[in-house]
Each structure stands twice: as structure tokens, then as C-alpha cells.
Amino acid sequence: MKNKGRGFTLVELLAVIVILAIILVIAVPKITDTIKNSKKASFESSAKTIAAQAEKKKMEKEILEDTGSISCSDIVKLNDTDYGNCSITFDGNTAKVSLVGKGKFEGLSVINGTKDNATAGEVKMPEYGKGTTYIKALYDSDILRVTNGLKKDNTSDANIRYEGANPNNYVSFNDELWRIIGVFGDNIKLVRTEELGKLSWDSSDSSVNDGYGVNEWSQADLKEYLNTMYYGGTSVTCYGGRNNSTTTCPTGSLNSTAKSMINNYTWNTGAINSSDTTIVIQETFTVNTVAFYNAERGSVTGKICTSGSDCNDTVTRTTTWPGYVALPYATDWAYASSETACATNINDGYDVANNNFDNMTCKKNNWMHHGSTRYEAMWMLSPYARSGVANVVWNVLGVGSVNSFRASLALSVFPSVYLNTEVKITSGSGSSSDPYILK
């Protein structure tokens, strides 16, 4: 009787397995390459679409005489799961998009892609760890430097800074969003994203400097509020006008976790002398950025006058101050703009002939800029040195110029801190929806 349905022999089974293995060896890489190329093409298409829409947006804004910057979020709602850092610059009317992928696009990036040409390359993110080391690693990558909005300034210190309309410099700090100004030596410098409130930099009795305050940070009323109350938790009197006019203190405070990360830093509080023509040219309102930066760290104090009702305080002047919380410098604001002119002239764009501030350059593509009018100003740290007065401080106006006001005026306060050298970045991409987490 014959066997029906004879099974496979061991040799035949082994042969089948070998054949299947060969098929897999040949087919799987091709399938993988197909999937990879499809993802790459899709990612490149996204960059081209953003560039095309950015150019349309630019035309619309020009018709409306709107000189504001254009960011990726103005163009399209990107899926945070699959898209990370995104930035837009313009070469004339040509939009250039830099885009980093994550999720299904992990490891892909486009640098300066246009609507007609966007080539995706592969990029590897640095390992999380010490914050300064992580940011320096981002800067050292040609791709990540661009997509994260990093640069080195043109000062002798060559500080790494974040620039542009919306770079990836958000951090979760004090259970709220702050932003990284840059890396200064071994410290990361932060500034609060939202204003804390409007306060005088300093005020005084009517018999002292005509009631307009004293432009010496080590004794300033705002210094007392930021370090004794906002940081220290002990109530102080807050001021909002001339002649020691009081106001309600802001309710914000720093929690214990945030305070543990803040360095007791020696801040430079040098004054900028408005009559120094290497810094300020009064006839053209030109302000030399590097010279201004050096003066912020210089030896001039806010009192170069010797007499007068605006110059009769007896306060000892200093050019450094050790403490926890202060304010940004005017040059921090200038270098936050990606406009190249701001590296040499903080007040570029001023129309001297018509005394017009409508087209100020450094407010453009500047993540740190606040406001749009002359009356929406933010206090800076440095005193303003001028003959005849000892009560004037530098600030940045909403119209986009550095300026000076009496210290007693109530302007917007954006606290700034330096982090301890060992603070780590443990996760996040630096976007507002996925800020860096510090530890």
C-alpha cells in the first residue's frame, strides 16, 4: 500500500528555510530603503511647503506694511510628535527653512531648504547632561546650530547665544516658561518669558536726585524686590513712581527647586556714558554694540556728575554686584536678533532726518523683544552715565531702540538669573510645547 501525502524530509525543510532566508536578506533591505526614502521625501516635502507658504506670508505682510518677523508657527501647525525645531530666514524674497525631525522623522533634518529644493540629511542629537556642555554640542553641529537658533557673538568673549524670532531656548523653570539667553563662561543665563510686573528701577525722596531715584543697582529698590522678596520670600516695599511713590508688589516668587539652581553670580553693573563717542554717536543715534557690551562690564559708574538737584545723592557707586536675580543687559536684547546689523549698531534703522523709529532693525527676528510702542519699555540692568544727572537707567522701548529713562518710571520687569554650573538638561527639545527640563 502506497503512502499518501508524504511529509517533507529534513533536507527539504532546511532547503526551504535557506531559500526563505535568502529572500529575506534580499528583500528586507529594499523594503527598509523604500520606507526610509518615503519618509525622507515626505520630510523634504514638508520643508518645501513651509518655504512656499512663508513667501506668500511675506508678500501679504508687505502689502499690509507689516515688518514683523515670520516663524514656522505662523505658517503651519506642525505635529510636535514628528517635527522638532523649525526656523525661517529670508534671502531677499526667498524663504529658507531649517527643520529637524523627531518621532517617525527622527534623525532627519533640512538646512536652508527652499520651496524648490530641500534635501534631508541625517543628524544625531547630543546626549543630555550638563547644560552648558549640551548647548555647546548643539552649537558645534552645523545642522543643529542653525535649527536651534544658535550663534557666537562678535565680542572678545565669543558667547554662545540664541537668536531669531523663535529659537528653541525654552526651559521649564519655576513651574513656568523661561528662555535661555545663552552660555556665558560656565553658566547658562535665563530670562523670564513673561513680564513679572511694572516697577520703578529705583525711587527716592524728593530731596534726593529730585525724587527720580539713584542709578546704583546695589541699592536699587528693584534689586531689593527681586532678591529679598521674589527670591528670598521676605516682603518689601515696591515703588512705581517719583518721590517714593509706592505700588503693589507683583505676586510671583521663586520656588525652592528653582532657587537651588540659581548661582550667586557677580553681575557687572558698569554704566554706559552717553558722551563717549566710541559708544554713542548722538547726531545719528548710532550705538556701537561691542563697545556697549564692554561698557556694561566696564569701570564707569552711573554718577559722573558733581552737582545739581538731579545729582545730590551720597550713595557709594560700584560696577559689580553679587546676587541671585537681576535684569538682562541691553546687548542681550540686541544679540537676540538674528539681523546682522545688530552686531554693530543696536539702534540700526533709526531715521535721523525725520526722528522716526518705525523701521528699527533689532526688534525684528528678536525673541526677546517686548511691546510695540514707546511706552512699552523693559528695564535693563545698566546705569546711564550723563553729565548733570545720576538717576537715569537704560531700557529698551517697544519701538525697538535702546533708550534711557529716569529710574523712578514704572517699566516692565523681566527677571534674569545665571544657573549653577552643574545644572543638567535631562529632556526636551527647547520648543514652547516641549521645553528643556532642568535638574
Set out the residue ranges of the language-model regions:
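N-terminal single-pass transmembrane signal-anchor helix
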Residues: K4-T32
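Sec-dependent signal peptide cleavage junction
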Residues: A27-F43, S431, P435-K439
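Long, domain-scale functional regions
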Residues: L64-D66, S71-G92, G103-G107, I111, ...
